[in-house]
């Protein structure tokens, strides 16, 4: 660890792509619902915290620590973090596992949501992915 004073936040854990799908109603099993619209956004506690802090334009460093797949979703997460001044040097890419994602099915008329989740790379995130000696973060979230 360097002698630089500690500053900023390192957020470690789940980095997820949320696919929000607005549907006309939740169907009974074996039935159909229409998807009216869909969007993609960040998901997972650490990712959400970092994005919120970036939106607040905080003046201290923000860093991500996690495991995403070496796929389109993983690249999207890395780009999104970089575009929001979030250091991704500890956001690792897995060759073996896809990026974790959630399909959030949202009923248009009620706002009620049901989630379908692929654990993907997050299920394999471990302490070995965290090089805590390589960070000067003051806070770990």
Locations of regions flagged by a protein language model:
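Glycine-rich phosphate/adenosyl-contacting loop at the front of the ribokinase-like
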Residues: 1-67, 72-79, 137
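Ribokinase/PfkB-type carbohydrate-kinase core domain
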Residues: 1-20, 67, 75-93, 97, ...
């Amino acid at each position: 660890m360097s002698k630089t004073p500690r500053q900023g936040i390192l957020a470690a854990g789940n980095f997820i792509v949320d696919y929000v799908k607005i549907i006309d109603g939740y169907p009974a099993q074996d039935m159909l619902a229409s998807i009216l619209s869909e969007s993609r956004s960040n998901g997972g506690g650490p990712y959400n915290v970092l994005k919120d802090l970036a939106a607040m334009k905080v003046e201290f460093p923000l860093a991500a620590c996690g495991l995403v797949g070496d796929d389109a979703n993983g690249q999207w997460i890395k780009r999104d973090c970089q575009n929001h001044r979030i250091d991704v040097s500890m956001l690792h890419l897995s060759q073996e596992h896809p990026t974790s994602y959630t399909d959030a099915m949202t009923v248009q008329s009620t706002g009620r949501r049901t989630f379908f989740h692929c654990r993907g790379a997050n299920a394999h995130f471990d302490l070995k992915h965290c090089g805590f000696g390589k960070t000067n973060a003051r806070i770990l979230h």
